[in-house]
Regions:
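Short, hydrophobic/aromatic-enriched beta-strand segments in well-ordered soluble domains
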Residues: 1, 70-84, 133-141, 178-185, ...
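Short, solvent-exposed loop/turn and secondary-structure capping segments
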Residues: 9-10, 53, 84-93, 146-149, ...
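Glycine/proline-rich low-complexity spacer/linker segments in large multi-domain proteins
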Residues: 2-5, 9-21, 79-133, 519-535
Length: 535
């Protein structure tokens, strides 16, 4: 991995923008500890093809074009060495897991409307092709194998899988072949360890959930709690984001931390928050199949939004769920390191800018969309997005079009400002005067990004009014979101830095005026959002 020297090192940094999970560990590996894949042959319909090696990308020079909708048989022969665990795939990680087998085979590059997506692999994001996997894993018989798929021969393998017995202990020979199947997925992950233990939960109207972990008595209760938590999480997930379409999902202790794959994830420990996050990737990466290299915010950000929402509902929390996401984005916006969230994942100047944009700003994009169109319409958008685009590789325009259809508003401006630029939001309460016996309130747009504006007026007698000011670029307005008196004002033209509106009461009756009391608008300076009228 590369490194960038920052002019102002962030907290917990030595001045180098390392990925702390990698740093210089790869350079210190011995020859028998490095990982590699060496493709020996690619044979198509019986004909060997010319190969060009570009490090992590293998180019196959076809002897004959493969035409659209035609079928070919590809025989790919390769050798690989399993590395000492550093990132993603490997053996003997810090938790003592013997094999964490992700990125373990040559994976087909996705060809879409933009052509080939041949991004060199630098242990960040990847974009794959859906297919049907039939995988046979032959390994010493004392190993339990976990994988993202359905086990076809549990009676032969044993180890507590549903339908299994102690056949593995009675079998002759030193090895057993585990037969796995995963259909309509774009990757396949597995892990193996002789001290693995498995527990299962069957979710109502949902999948069979497996939790596979290294047996340590002191941690047993943690893994049981993780399994139990999925029972309460799934109804929230399905109701909000759509049903999980596969028969099984497996949480596997392994790898170097949370990393998502179809039908399974690798996690280090029994963190319920991490587990929920990785499972939610099944909606925004595994089912949608968005090009995560180009649109990481559509996967990591939407997944972070979903994680916060599901965890908060599980805990029966009320109020604002997304404080950490907003804090992450606002810190980035003020740091001087921000780049547009539309930047390719591999080409950010700093890891900090990438992670804060992909996770924090991506989550804020959804939460703030609820502010623009209303949370009730956002809920409809999320389900419509799932129903319209699962298994179809959507891009940002596809999501925006769904949001526009469900809300009846124009929203391309929102993507262009918030994702394609680094312009920030800052609104302030300006002057308050009397005109024709009514209070005339002036608002100012200080930042460069225009937004619709909600204004709460609290009166000295305790009564309140909410005034929502649509942005003219929306060509519409959101419905009322509360039971207090709700007034929709005339639209605010995006070219105008100031806007004024009236309330039917006098200035002396007003106690305070506050912009965006819900805190959903990502205003970089909330100090000027509230004005208290002195007695």
């Amino acid at each position: 991995m590369g490194k960038i020297r920052l002019s102002e090192p962030r907290r917990n940094s030595d001045g180098l923008d390392w990925d702390d999970r990698v740093r210089d560990r790869i350079s210190k590996l011995q020859p028998n500890e490095i990982g590699y894949q060496q493709v020996k042959k690619v044979i198509i319909n019986g004909v060997a093809q010319q190969l060009k090696d570009h490090e992590t990308i293998l180019e196959v020079v076809l002897s004959k074009p493969i035409l659209p909708k035609s079928k070919v048989m590809i025989d790919l022969q390769f050798e690989a060495q399993v590395p000492l665990q550093v990132r993603r795939s490997g053996r003997d990680n810090k938790e003592g897991i013997r094999y964490s087998m992700s990125q373990w085979y040559p994976k087909m590059v996705e060809y879409d409307y933009q052509g080939w997506n041949a991004n060199p692999y630098i242990a960040r994001e990847f974009y794959g092709v859906w297919g049907d996997y039939d995988v046979n894993i032959t390994i010493q018989k004392d190993y339990l194998v976990a994988a993202g798929g359905d086990l076809l021969n549990p009676a032969e393998t044993g180890f507590g899988y549903p339908g299994s017995n102690d056949a593995s202990k009675k079998s002759t020979g030193n090895t057993i072949t585990w037969k796995w199947q995963a259909y309509n997925v774009h990757d396949f992950v597995w892990a193996a360890d002789p001290q693995y233990k498995i527990i299962t939960r069957t979710l109502a109207n949902g999948p069979l959930v497996r939790v596979v972990y290294k047996q340590i008595d002191s941690l047993e209760a943690n893994w049981q709690r993780l399994a139990d938590s999925m029972v309460s999480a799934y109804p929230i997930i399905a109701r909000t984001f759509g049903a999980y379409p596969y028969k099984t999902y497996t949480f596997i202790q392994g790898g170097d931390g949370g990393m998502e794959y179809p039908m399974a994830t690798l996690i280090k420990s029994a963190s319920i928050g991490t587990a929920i996050h990785e499972w939610m990737h099944s909606w925004f990466q595994m089912m949608m199949g968005t090009n995560e290299s180009l649109y990481a915010w559509m996967d990591e950000g939407f997944t972070d939004y979903a994680t916060n929402r599901v965890m908060s509902e599980m805990r029966r929390e009320t109020g604002f769920y997304f404080t950490n996401s907003y804090r992450s984005y606002l810190n980035l916006a003020k740091s001087g390191y921000e780049e547009p969230a539309s930047t390719h994942s591999d080409h950010y100047n700093t890891n900090y800018a990438y992670s804060s944009a992909a996770y924090g700003k991506g989550a804020v994009f959804l939460a703030q969309l609820g502010y623009i169109v209303s949370d009730s319409l956002l809920n409809k958008i999320l389900l419509a997005y799932y129903n319209t685009w699962r298994f179809k590789h959507p891009n940002p325009n596809d999501f925006i079009r769904v949001a526009e259809k469900e809300s009846g508003m124009e929203l391309d401006w929102y993507k262009e400002y918030f994702i394609n630029s680094t312009k920030t939001i800052d609104y302030s309460v300006g002057d308050v005067n009397m005109k024709d016996g009514k209070a005339l309130i002036t608002l100012k747009r200080v930042g460069k990004m225009p937004m619709p504006v909600d204004v709460l007026i609290t009166f000295k007698d305790g009564s309140k009014e909410m005034h929502t000011i649509p942005l003219n670029l929306m060509y519409g307005n959101k419905p009322a979101e509360s039971s207090i008196p709700w007034f929709t004002e005339t639209e605010w033209k995006w070219t105008h830095p100031e806007y004024a509106f009236s309330t039917n009461r006098s200035v002396k009756e007003i106690k305070s005026i506050e912009i965006d009391p819900s805190m959903r608008m990502a205003d970089i300076n909330r100090v000027n959002n509230r004005l208290i009228i002195p007695d």
